[in-house]
Amino acid sequence: MSLNAMNSCEIEFERNVNLQAGAISIGRASDNDLRIPDQTVSAHHARIFTYLEASFIEDLGSTNGTYLNGKRVQKHTLHPGDVIQVGRLELKVTKDN
């Protein structure tokens, strides 16, 4: 599975991010894999990881929350078509061909 940015928030990562690469950190700090320069995003906001061929999103105690399909989540399985929202950025989970 991959992530695709759905809006024009200027972020420092490729438009397509492969979720099979292990854990991916998301946040405002420069040491994140997906750096989001948005004041509504915590320094270390969330992470996405794969375990036994399933991918998960996990909030890391962020102030403003991590949303999956419009609902605030702490930890949840990801499926193709899901939409993750972190700050003002929306990312769509897609299935690789």
Spans of model-derived segments:
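C-terminal boundary/linker segments immediately following FHA domains
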Residues: 56, 67-97
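Intrinsically disordered, low-complexity acidic Ser/Thr-rich regulatory segments
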Residues: 1-37, 49
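Amphipathic hydrophobic-ligand
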Residues: 41-43
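Short strand-coil-strand connectors
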Residues: 13, 37, 51, 69, ...
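General beta-strand recognition
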Residues: 25, 35, 49, 54-56, ...
